[in-house]
């Protein structure tokens, strides 16, 4: 083996070289193309050009191998071209119009009328003060059918209530009075789902003294909305009451009867029944009417057909551009506008299996006809009837296939050419397999829809990615196969020309190869360090000017490293220089056997690294950048496109309003009704109204009227008038005393009266003790006062003393005037008294029918002459 390794060929693979040192013999490194790409170095030596292009940053390791000559111990052969399978889109797509249905979770809403009488029995206690409620009993009783007919015709209701409790019949009268007809008046407080009408505002009564038990009967008629959910076995109202009977219950039916927990006598069906609208007074058209008598109320509603009123499915979306993609075991309905894809079985679904789904064909046909008329009537024709498929998640898809006019004409011509028309494909009904979205019942199947359509959006995204990736992989496989076949042909030819390069490329490492007929002998190569290689810049043979080398020449030596693959028998030759030439693809050839006669105008390019070396006249000239030489590519372009952007659109199957209305009872309506019920009365002050014992006197008046006839009625009226006056006075006093401000005012008045009484008492006592001083203050000096000195006047320097009797005269004059005033006051008082006495006497005579005498004309009081004279003065 060592002897075989001595016969070696040297292959040098230089990718991105490292810097090489050079000596006087022309040892050089590899030129970095970044430094010499745009520079013409001119006519310089090969070693100088190589040395000036030393790279700064080696990228690919330089590896040089010495290969032994293959002997045939290891042989290889090339495979034959394969047949390439062309990947085609095997999916079958059909365009059309789709209408998607979902489960109808909304309750069935209808109008009902509630009839009942609200009975309130109140026991109160009062003792000339505010009344106190000691007991209260409230109940609701139903109204019988005959009175309901009167209510719906005339709008009046009786104040009497007859009801059955504890196996006994009871009667109640409003205000404890005789039965009478009262009009139904609207309640001012109402909501969008309820309207109420009633007959009275008074619910509690009392009297001023003692206990009183009274009864009020309020006839109530309410217009309400009722709700019922599938399977429609009961319904609820805004009042919070639930009725355990189906809204579609009827006695006259040939099929199974609907749910009801009531006896038959409680349910009535009336044909051609007319109802009066209590708000507008209009009579509605006659309809079949149902009445149900409950323990607390009677309820009425219009009879309805179940199949015409409700549907278990509702239309969700309309898709004008839908694509049905056929896979091996399923259909995928792609809704691009909605970014969703629904998968289903390949067999159509029979909608006759569904319970209460008669509305689906009608709605689907109307929607598809409208879309086709707006968008496709001039460009497409319909292909077959509407088909229904049960999609994943509980969605029913109504699909109408479409075909363009050109394609339809082509099919028609082909059918006529074959002398027959295409038969419509028989519709295969869906198998009886069970799905998670289909529930069976005694009356039929029912579709249940998932509350989220996220899975459909993910399915759409997956189908888009799957289609794109499958197309990409198919193109890759086809291109790869064709490329391999083309390369095989080239390699079969290359093995004849240069088996070393071919086998090195195939094995992925430098090898030596030799053609042995139709097979190739291969042997490994030994790596030589790049520091042991020296190149020369002249291609002329020394000693013979007519002969030249066909490729650049070089000198190399083996490595002395212990890791070297060189044989131990040749270690003594590691310092020997071995002559060689630069081969193709940066390979080193052993020996210098490639020669030719020197030619004139010689010009050659040899690959070295990433660039080419230009030789003219067998002498190195310059390095040429590879980009300056036009490249002929044999690369096959791969037909692949990048995924397009896809924005997901949030899809909400059920809106917030739909989810809120899923229950039988609406919490908002119940709360609003309770609040309205508590505040139904128009005047809150009339809730408690005092009776004041009128019932007792009314009974006395009725007794006189019934026993004494007309005289008794007159006497009863007098008694009632007097009693009313007395009761009003007593009630006024009691009300005044019960007022806290009245007590405060009375206290203040008492204090002021006491103060005024004390002042008057003091004045009278002073008047009795000293009348002159009280009446004429200052006229008499008080006791102990010294006499006032006489005043003197000086006139003409003479002193004149005033007479002291002048003061006495003034005092006497004042006293006389005071007496005169007192006399006048006394006369005035006597006259007024006399006039009042005369008036009283005349009134007595008038009542006694006594004739007037002459004495009556005389004055009642004689005045003395001195008084008349004084009065004249």
Curated annotation (Swiss-Prot):
Sugar-modified residues: 92, 111, 201, 252, 350, 569, 625, 639
Transmembrane segment boundaries: 741-761
UniProtKB keywords: Disulfide bond, Glycoprotein, Host cell membrane, Host endosome, Host Golgi apparatus, Host membrane, Host-virus interaction, Membrane, Signal, Transmembrane, Transmembrane helix, Viral attachment to host cell, Viral envelope protein, Virion, Virus entry into host cell
Segments in the Intravirion topological domain: 762-873
Region called Hydrophobic membrane proximal region, residue ranges: 684-738, 715-734
Membrane topology according to the record: Single-pass type I membrane protein
Main location group: virion
Modification(s) after translation: A proteolytic cleavage by host furin generates two subunits that remain linked by disulfide bonds.
Biased composition (Acidic residues): 796-807
Record's keyword annotation contains Acetylation: no
Virion surface side: 22-740
Residue segments, region Disordered: 418-447, 781-807
Annotated InterPro entries: Glycoprot_B_PH1, Glycoprot_B_PH2, Glycoprot_B_PH2_sf, Glycoprotein_B_ecto_C, Herpes_Glycoprot_B
Motif (Internalization motif): 858-861
Subcellular localization: Virion membrane; Host cell membrane; Host endosome membrane; Host Golgi apparatus membrane
GO biological process: symbiont entry into host cell; virion attachment to host cell
Disulfide linkage: 67-525, 84-481, 157-219, 311-359, 548-598
Any one cellular-component term (Gene Ontology): membrane
Family as reported in the entry's similarity comment: Belongs to the herpesviridae glycoprotein B family.
Function, as annotated: Envelope glycoprotein that forms spikes at the surface of virion envelope. Essential for the initial attachment to heparan sulfate moieties of the host cell surface proteoglycans. Involved in fusion of viral and cellular membranes leading to virus entry into the host cell. Following initial binding to its host receptors, membrane fusion is mediated by the fusion machinery composed at least of gB and the heterodimer gH/gL. May be involved in the fusion between the virion envelope and the outer nuclear membrane during virion egress.
Assembly information from the UniProt record: Homotrimer; disulfide-linked. Binds to heparan sulfate proteoglycans. Interacts with gH/gL heterodimer.
Official protein name in the record: Envelope glycoprotein B
Source species: Infectious laryngotracheitis virus (strain 632) (ILTV)
